[in-house]
Amino acid sequence: MSKNNSTVIKMDEQVLKYKEDLYEKTVHHLKVTIPKKIAEYQELAKSYGQNSENEQDGQTSKKRKLDSEDYVLMPIEDLIKTNRVIMETHQKFKKAYIELIETFSVIRGWISLNIPRIEDGNNFGVDVQEDIITQITKLEEVYTSLLDGSESYFASRASLVKKILKHKDIEAYRYSLAQVDEKEFTRFSFSYFDLANNYATTYSLIVKNFAKLETPRPTNASNIY
Amino acid sequence: MSKNNSTVIKMDEQVLKYKEDLYEKTVHHLKVTIPKKIAEYQELAKSYGQNSENEQDGQTSKKRKLDSEDYVLMPIEDLIKTNRVIMETHQKFKKAYIELIETFSVIRGWISLNIPRIEDGNNFGVDVQEDIITQITKLEEVYTSLLDGSESYFASRASLVKKILKHKDIEAYRYSLAQVDEKEFTRFSFSYFDLANNYATTYSLIVKNFAKLETPRPTNASNIY
Amino acid sequence: MSKNNSTVIKMDEQVLKYKEDLYEKTVHHLKVTIPKKIAEYQELAKSYGQNSENEQDGQTSKKRKLDSEDYVLMPIEDLIKTNRVIMETHQKFKKAYIELIETFSVIRGWISLNIPRIEDGNNFGVDVQEDIITQITKLEEVYTSLLDGSESYFASRASLVKKILKHKDIEAYRYSLAQVDEKEFTRFSFSYFDLANNYATTYSLIVKNFAKLETPRPTNASNIY
Amino acid sequence: MSKNNSTVIKMDEQVLKYKEDLYEKTVHHLKVTIPKKIAEYQELAKSYGQNSENEQDGQTSKKRKLDSEDYVLMPIEDLIKTNRVIMETHQKFKKAYIELIETFSVIRGWISLNIPRIEDGNNFGVDVQEDIITQITKLEEVYTSLLDGSESYFASRASLVKKILKHKDIEAYRYSLAQVDEKEFTRFSFSYFDLANNYATTYSLIVKNFAKLETPRPTNASNIY
Amino acid sequence: MSKNNSTVIKMDEQVLKYKEDLYEKTVHHLKVTIPKKIAEYQELAKSYGQNSENEQDGQTSKKRKLDSEDYVLMPIEDLIKTNRVIMETHQKFKKAYIELIETFSVIRGWISLNIPRIEDGNNFGVDVQEDIITQITKLEEVYTSLLDGSESYFASRASLVKKILKHKDIEAYRYSLAQVDEKEFTRFSFSYFDLANNYATTYSLIVKNFAKLETPRPTNASNIY
Amino acid sequence: MSKNNSTVIKMDEQVLKYKEDLYEKTVHHLKVTIPKKIAEYQELAKSYGQNSENEQDGQTSKKRKLDSEDYVLMPIEDLIKTNRVIMETHQKFKKAYIELIETFSVIRGWISLNIPRIEDGNNFGVDVQEDIITQITKLEEVYTSLLDGSESYFASRASLVKKILKHKDIEAYRYSLAQVDEKEFTRFSFSYFDLANNYATTYSLIVKNFAKLETPRPTNASNIY
Amino acid sequence: MSKNNSTVIKMDEQVLKYKEDLYEKTVHHLKVTIPKKIAEYQELAKSYGQNSENEQDGQTSKKRKLDSEDYVLMPIEDLIKTNRVIMETHQKFKKAYIELIETFSVIRGWISLNIPRIEDGNNFGVDVQEDIITQITKLEEVYTSLLDGSESYFASRASLVKKILKHKDIEAYRYSLAQVDEKEFTRFSFSYFDLANNYATTYSLIVKNFAKLETPRPTNASNIY
């Protein structure tokens, strides 16, 4: 501190405007974007589940998921081609994951800017804010790491294809490749349900505690700027 | 919070409908799906155990599990073929694991959406909800990682077969391959018992505490939406 | 919870029958299987110890354990053969380990199903149940990882044999192989004592606390179904 | 301590001047630099988001982000060229990250030098200082590690290009390269929002608690030199 | 628990006999085996120390430990031979380590079987039992991992000899080999002292607290069976 | 303790003299060395910052930092030459880091020797001593690991140059090398500020608490020897 | 415990004699060995520091430490020769480290054997004993791991020399080798100071608390045997 007097630093108008902008986006997300997303993914989870069942009972022509046996009998030129269905589904899910991260990072941004001055008590509301920021940050980290899913899928596929080409007589490499592709379909079958579930659980946490997020210390509102 | 007034955000009807849908599925799972699964896996554990005993006493013709010695004497072309029994049993267990994950993630979803607003006390019911969500999440993680079992089995088998082909005179690689296959049979012999046991233990935890899961704070039901 | 009334979910008869079946097996294990195992392994530990001593004093013809020097002088064709005694002993111990895991996982299963509803106090009995479940789970994990022992033994042996064949003049690889085999014999010499000791210690813990395992909350038995 | 008398050591004038210099820079950053940065990155986040949307609807000629398919069809000489847009955007972000680190390390330096003598109580203000130093240090560590982003991007790109050149028929390597580049664009799309958000959250924390940072122990100012 | 009555399970006579057998061995170890071992290793530590000093002053003809320089000048055929002294000393120490493990695992076994029923208080004696079991387990783990010492010594020696043969002009590999052998001699010089010290410290802990190990809960002896 | 009487052991005069010598060096460092260093590095940070700005605006002839593009166009013989400026700056910083470690390890040595006898209370002063020893030890560890910086820089540079020579057509390796060199200049730009900041923060901590470091327990000075 | 009576086990006379022997060595170390070592290393630190300064100002003929440039210009046959000064200094330090470990492990041994029976209170003295045993164990671990220093130095040197021979045109490998050697000289320059400092700090801790180490529970000496 300067030797003679202490300096008064106030929240800059531009920053308050930035916070207000995040607040409006937050309200829009809670009233419109998120409920719509939950309904959308609930439907997609149902229809995706239905498709897999039809496929297992042979009702659909276009088989997305091959059986392990197919991988052993398939000529090598087909084997090393990338499965179009897997690639397209990856792109769809990446868009969905980016949307989720963008939506909740706005809400996290607003809550962080709404944390009042550190005080030696009366912190229940601040604990709620910090608890919810932690939950949202965890959610964003899960979906950020899921974004790397396709890179690691292609890397494993490429290295197995390399081994298949090098050791044409070792059947187990082909089965291993079958498992790598099958795992993607298994993950897809959970992904829509998980998206609906994660949106809903985090939405429910925020909505039920919105009053505390807005006014962490009810008595003296002034300290929140 | 907007400078002048605070916004009221209510749980969206679509989300409440989503929660109701999860609730009905949860009740169905507790009354029908899970008890049926426990009985099914209890039987499979008994019959699987019986088969292994008959096989050891040479009563069954079709030997699923070869002895180590077989692996040393077997011609290389047979050695490098994948064991059909192991592959089929993998596929059966993967289906069972996916079913378990789907069943309990629905229940976890409902419980999460039933967690009331964060309050500074009267949280015994919420602690029960969070404790059971943690147990279910752990169960789902165990079975999600078990889904990778077949990929790592084929990868180890392939790399050992490669070494056997390259070092035909090193007996120990063949014994190592025998252990890799034998370990799968040992795992299968535990898997049905573990499935019955895990379904039953988690079911017992949920059923005995269902009242608290439904109504974590008895006095004022309104705060659960 | 459904908006109008709360649902009563009771423990399904099939699950209670499953629990009863585990209970009867538990009593049988405590009264018959385990005491018999402890005596059996106590004897095997003594006789195994006796054999090693006779062998060191050269009394027995068939030397199971070779000295390091033998490994340096031995022709390479013999060196790369797997030691029959080690393989047979592995198979014996694997059977013993599987039996131990099966025996205690049944007891663990029964105790888990006997954990009463979560309550905010009067939990001393439940703590005893959870403490003993933790001890049994640790024991099962130790013996499950010991099951992998033979696979890693053969993998180390194979890779050393490969180096010996490649670098015939490097004596130290042959000594290293001698150590790998010798370590198996050292482990065997402890294994029977450890089996007796682990069975006895876990048995003693369960038997001394059996009343609490059966009736964790003495006053009101109804809550255990 | 010297056997006879204790030595009085006072804060050197040069060090007090150094602290005063950091203090003035801190005030300038809080009043000018940081609010300007928040507004700047808020704008960049909006305009960057807008560009990506236009690009996806094909409105802009210069496509920064290629689709996976482009990577499979592209001739190898183009494939192995580094994407100019990615490189330029890296350089821009590195400048922004260095600025952020320089800005907040000055503020951290001032706060550290303003921590008073260790006392056995009356430490609420010191806890606020230490808490904020921890937050700033975390922020600096995040952006220091982000500085390594471009080195690891080029290393992954180089090693994938090497594999593509070596295994021209393995399509999956090309898709893997597409993911590596696409990931950079996804990171860029978050980076401006994160910069605005991190500046604002840390700024809000410092400004709201500036009084405590300046005068951690209100009663006796003398102990802060 | 069976729906109608609770079962009484008592400690099986065979198990009590097993415990009694461990008890007698424990008393013998404390009165005879261990004091003798401490004296023996105290002597060996002194005489080993004396030999090293004589060797450094050149008094002994047979130099066990070569200087680094010897390794550079030595012809390659001698260099790649394993140092007889190191091998023989390894075998001696392995015998000593196995003895230590066998001795204390018997004592640990007895103490474990003497742990009374879990009670909600009056546990000071039980804490002493568990503390001493932890100390003995740590000691067994240290000496079990030391048993692997010779395997890793030969593995490092073999891989360095391989490099020396491949890069005859790189002096530093020969110095590295000198360090690997020298390190064994340094370890040997500590090993006898450590054996005496570990035996004595653990013995002192057990003897001083023997009353508590025998009778953890003085008042009612019946609960220990 | 010897069976009959207890031995009195006093601090040896040579050790007290050693402590006095450390004390005098400590006072000299706090009054002279450190303030001078803080001022010196504050200046160097400013001038280093100024140079980089001039360079970016092209005012200086001798460009220390090349742009990524230079690395792609540069002939390979120049590319594989080590950047003189980076090497010289490394040597300068290593000297500065060694000085910092020597300066503060003397102060840490004195404080450690001034820790009084362990007592069951009245330990506030001792806690201050131990807290400051921990801070200084952390500082020394940071700068000891920074000393390894140049070894790892040359190792990364060498391995990238090797790849560039092997894969002349893979541009990304050249960009990767550009990043490795650029990272050193970025680190240099922070290093002088960090040196000033770390000296100042640790100095301020020691000076403000010097009375407690000298006399941790005011009442009875005798126990500090 | 045997079913009828409890056994009295007393500390064996040989063990008490062993403890007395450690006690006498401890007193000798505290009165003679350690103070002498502190003075010796204090001197060596000063003279080593003096030599480095003279060398930097070119006063001494025999340059122990070469500059990085020397490594680039030096013919390869000289480069691959091991630096005699580094090797001799390693041997000197190894002797010093072994002495330190032997000295303090004797003291640790005595303290451990002087720990009284575990009691439910009155444990301040025992806490002091355990705290000091922990400090001495940490010191022994630091110097045991430093003993491996020369092995890892020669391993790094050998692998860099291999790379220099393989890639004669990559200058950076020669600079990397210069850093590896320079790091040893930097470590040497700290080692004597650290030896003096570690001896002194541990000595000061033991001497100031010697009364508690000897008589942890003043009231009743009998329980210490």
Swiss-Prot record, chains A, B, C, D, E, F, G:
Transmembrane segments: none
Primary localization: nucleus
Cellular localisation: Nucleus
A Gene Ontology biological process term: regulation of G1/S transition of mitotic cell cycle
Annotated GO CC locations: cytoplasm; nucleoplasm; nucleus; proteasome activator complex; protein-containing complex
Pfam families: PA28_C
Xref: InterPro entries: PA28_C (IPR003186), PA28_C_sf (IPR036997), Proteasome_activ_PA28 (IPR009077), Proteasome_activ_sf (IPR036252)
Subunit structure: Homoheptamer. The homoheptamer associates with the 20S proteasome.
Protein family according to the UniProt entry: Belongs to the PA28 family.
Protein name (Swiss-Prot/TrEMBL): Proteasome activator 28
